[in-house]
């Protein structure tokens, strides 16, 4: 079952880099949270997308929301991608695809690759609802 508008979201943990877990239960239900699902680190479209977000960061900061990018890449890759782009928010690794499945954002086939995250955005309010 996938998450839809109005549904409550439970917290979950994902690695931001090897050995560093981010527990979204600490902010879901108490703060606004923006989840940016993206297919692949270092791909041209994802690079352009995250550079645009970085360059217009004040629009996100003005929302008072915590922002997290999520992909199926390893935490080594997401950490390097975030570092190279100078992102002001963490990119999280969902290698096991549990969170992508929960939000129903997996491509069955993307250029011959199975179970890659769909480019999707979810905004979760302070009460924990999408």
Report the location of each language-model feature.
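Chalcogenol-based redox active-site neighborhoods
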Residues: 1-130
């Amino acid at each position: 079952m996938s998450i839809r508008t109005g549904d409550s979201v439970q917290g979950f943990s994902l690695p931001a880099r090897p050995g560093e877990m981010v527990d979204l239960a600490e902010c879901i239900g108490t703060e606004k949270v923006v989840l940016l699902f993206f297919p692949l680190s270092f791909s041209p479209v994802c690079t352009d997308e995250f550079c645009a977000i970085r360059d217009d960061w004040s629009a996100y900061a003005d929302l008072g929301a915590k922002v997290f990018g999520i992909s199926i890449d390893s935490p080594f890759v997401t950490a390097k991608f975030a570092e190279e782009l100078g992102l002001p928010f963490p990119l999280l690794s969902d290698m096991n695809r549990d969170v992508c499945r929960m939000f129903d954002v997996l491509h069955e086939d993307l250029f011959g690759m199975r179970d890659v995250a769909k480019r999707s955005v979810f905004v979760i309010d302070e009460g924990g609802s999408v």
